[in-house]
């Protein structure tokens, strides 16, 4: 059963004018998809909103609580009683080192990606992290484990985390903004986005640009409405396949996300036009399945593929 922690204030609902971003956040939580949010310069409410991701995250199951408490204990940390059922939400500073992110040290302690196990790792202003730190995320995002070695001793820690990143669209932050003028050169934009690399971005199923025209989402959602959609979507996924959509492996995607000719045609056409990778092709299918689950729809048709493509925005620099 999908349950949420009680919320005693309405600060989430008070951040108006962010209906599209709120929906994108709920979509990410519903299917446990990794998400990249491209921010709008000067709109500080977006920074406040992404810090409220925990309000959308369901409680930990008892089994999940055991593994989380065990990892935190290895790090010499203790989760207080009122935190036991809450999903970990880690947001390290941009100066975080590889050791701090992935773990290490004399006694091989877990790092941020393991402390975020069964929860979320939020990298705000991700472009300000070291390139080496960002690239280290690729393997644990795939394997859900991290293996550390020191002095001939190897230790593995679970790191099944959901990744959320925010970034400006360019060094000056104005690219794509209808109300501002971007002063960046094409070369500076290229250097800016190359910090992420194509392999890392391929592991991000949702790329949401708050500067783009999101007219397909024209509603101001409340926290209770989004929680209801998340609960509905996750319940359906667990009943159908025993896991959330982002966790489906290649052989399960075709089994649980069958596409009719119309939907397949829309997706194939988009792939031919944009040159999306095979991994992003599958990501679109998974996000479309989650969108349908949020709306209580059984089959993924062409319309849901089109909606999912809206959540895979074109980046300022194409790899």
Each language-model region and where it sits:
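Conserved Walker B
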Residues: 119, 125-129
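Conserved RecA-like P-loop NTPase ATPase core
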Residues: 25, 50, 65, 101, ...
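Dynamic helix-loop-helix/coil hinge segments at AAA+ ATPase domain boundaries and subdomain interfaces
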Residues: 2-22, 59
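Walker A/P-loop
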Residues: 30, 35-78
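Conserved alpha-helical scaffold flanking the Walker A/P-loop in AAA+ ATPase domains
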Residues: 26-28, 83, 88, 99-121
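Conserved P-loop NTPase mechanochemical-coupling segment
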Residues: 60-66, 74-100
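Phosphate-binding P-loop
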Residues: 4-5, 17-18, 26-32, 41, ...
């Amino acid at each position: 059963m999908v349950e949420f922690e009680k919320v005693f204030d309405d600060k989430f609902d008070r951040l108006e004018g962010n209906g599209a971003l709120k929906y994108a956040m709920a979509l990410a939580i519903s299917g446990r998809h990794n998400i990249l949010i491209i921010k709008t310069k000067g709109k500080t409410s977006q920074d406040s909103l992404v810090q409220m991701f925990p309000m959308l995250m369901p409680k930990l199951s008892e089994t999940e609580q055991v593994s989380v408490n065990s990892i935190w204990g290895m790090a010499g940390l203790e989760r207080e009683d009122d935190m036991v059922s809450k999903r970990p939400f880690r947001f390290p500073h941009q100066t975080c080192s590889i050791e701090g992110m992935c773990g290490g040290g004399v006694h091989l302690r877990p790092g941020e990606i393991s402390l975020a196990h069964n929860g979320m790792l939020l990298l705000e202003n991700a472009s300000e992290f070291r390139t080496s730190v960002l690239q280290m995320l690729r393997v644990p995002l795939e394997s859900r484990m991290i293996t550390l070695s020191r002095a001939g001793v190897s230790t593995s820690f679970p790191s099944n985390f959901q990744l959320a990143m925010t970034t400006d669209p360019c060094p000056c932050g104005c690219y794509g903004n209808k109300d501002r003028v971007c002063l960046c050169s094409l070369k500076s934009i290229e250097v800016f986005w190359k910090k992420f690399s194509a392999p890392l971005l391929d592991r991000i199923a949702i790329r949401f640009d708050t500067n783009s025209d999101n007219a397909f989402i024209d509603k101001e959602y409340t926290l209770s409405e989004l929680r209801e959609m998340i609960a509905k979507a996750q319940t359906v996924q667990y009943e159908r396949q025993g896991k959330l959509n982002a966790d489906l492996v290649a052989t399960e995607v075709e089994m649980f996300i069958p596409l009719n000719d119309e939907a397949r045609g829309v997706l194939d056409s988009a792939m031919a036009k944009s040159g999306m990778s095979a991994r992003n092709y599958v990501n679109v299918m998974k996000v479309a399945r989650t969108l349908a689950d949020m709306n209580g729809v059984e089959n993924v048709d062409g319309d849901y593929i089109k909606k999912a493509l809206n959540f895979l925005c074109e980046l300022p620099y194409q790899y």
